[in-house]
């Protein structure tokens, strides 16, 4: 599908596949519980685990993160450009939907300059959920054709290329810098 068709699907609270820095991601509107529920069912992902949000700028995350707990040093860390994609675990707002953060009082966010993510967020006005596009036990998809093989020929997938990162993002705690997932 082209970018316009994918944007329409996202606005209709559908789940789509889109390229990220290393692999294809499954994403939807994080403000829509029905969209997130569809994503969790499709991915067979336990709700307790929470989800990653991805966007081209920090502003897209302000509805989800507790900004008061983040000091200027941590803001700099979030805004910095890194040689590889990094997802940061940050404090979530107290009223954040549990379907996004699972059993945690935090949420994982990643600022991405991938052109697909930039266009999708700018055109929809929201960050995207981001979980790797693959069924349980199968490697994440690196091409739109692989997505169609796993999820069906009619699955809405954006026909663009993934970035040059060799592996999906590493995940780190913003405050402790502890590595949660190796990238």
UniProtKB/Swiss-Prot annotation:
One of its GO terms (molecular function) is tRNA binding. Transmembrane segments: none annotated. GO terms for biological process: regulation of translational fidelity; tRNA threonylcarbamoyladenosine modification. It is found in: Cytoplasm. GO terms for cellular component: cytoplasm. InterPro entries: DHBP_synth_RibB-like_a/b_dom, Sua5-like_dom, TC-AMP_synthase, TC-AMP_synthase_SUA5. Its main location: cytoplasm. Residues 1-183 form the YrdC-like domain. It catalyses: L-threonine + hydrogencarbonate + ATP = L-threonylcarbamoyladenylate + diphosphate + H2O. Keywords: ATP-binding, Cytoplasm, Nucleotide-binding, Nucleotidyltransferase, Transferase, tRNA processing. The keyword Nucleotidyltransferase applies. It comes from the Bacteria. Its EC number is 2.7.7.87. Pfam families: Sua5_yciO_yrdC (PF01300). Required for the formation of a threonylcarbamoyl group on adenosine at position 37 (t(6)A37) in tRNAs that read codons beginning with adenine. Catalyzes the conversion of L-threonine, HCO(3)(-)/CO(2) and ATP to give threonylcarbamoyl-AMP (TC-AMP) as the acyladenylate intermediate, with the release of diphosphate. Belongs to the SUA5 family. TsaC subfamily. This is Threonylcarbamoyl-AMP synthase. It comes from Histophilus somni (strain 129Pt) (Haemophilus somnus). The gene is tsaC.
